[in-house]
Amino acid sequence: MTRRRFYAPRIAFAADSNTITLSDDEARHARDVLRLGRDDEVFVFDGEGREYRCVIADIGSRSMTLTVAEETEAAKPESRLDLTLAVALLKGEKFDLVVQKATELGVTRLVPLITTRADVRIRDPQDAARKVERWQRIALESAKQCGRARLTLVNAPTDLDELLRSITDVHLGVMFTARDGGSVEAAFESKPDFKTVIAMVGSEGGWTDEELTQARKHEWQLVTLGGRTLRAETAAIVAATLLQHRLGDLG
């Protein structure tokens, strides 16, 4: 039987962790769409990796209270790979697709990247906040669908220079590029003791020569995804899939 899964952040848990109050949106979906009632069984995940089997205790007009029966294993286990995927801002629904598929593929964090050739510009902090809120909602819906108990965290849009400088000894930085790149195996061998991976994918226009030079300067590894020209959203999905296959839980 398919689990009826709902999201509740830790703030929604009572101090003793025995009861959970669902948000208005989650409660409305349970009550009005799924037609659930008192004593029905549901599952709740907290976005941090924990999942609980619960029973509906009370139904209000704008909320729903659940009694926690037990902590249970998540519907799907998390990948052992701590993967940050940074993708140049893309037009329209392309970035929405990246958010959805990155969540399904077990990406830990998603960074909207501001690059020279990015398809979209951020007008002001309010515009950035609206976009991040939208993308985080997409990540939440995708997590519900694919069975993850941990949410992919969508960061605020970040300048490429800032991300390039953020690399440390425990990070393996991989810049996927259509030119001047090597193999993913060579990238792994360049820093055998890495703990996490930060992978970057550019826009349709690719990276500028200056961006490639800066990446090398900060010891990022340049990697190609084969000889075919991929759309940016396809490249992002392929990059995440490749890294999860080699280092995570795919295959």
Region roles according to the model:
Residues 73-175:
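RNA substrate-binding interface of SAM-dependent RNA methyltransferases
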Residues 66, 151-155, 222:
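Generic structural signal for residues in well-ordered beta-strands
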Residues 209-251:
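Structured adenosyl-cofactor binding patch, chiefly the S-adenosyl-L-methionine
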Residues 72, 204-205, 227-230:
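Short, acidic/turn-prone active-site loops that include or flank metal/cofactor-
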Residues 1-74:
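N-terminal positively charged helical leader segments and presequences
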Residues 20-22, 80-84, 195-198, 217-225:
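Glycine/charged-rich beta-loop-alpha catalytic/anionic-binding loops adjacent to active sites
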Residues 170-206, 211, 220-223:
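Active-site/ligand-binding-proximal alpha/beta "capping" segment
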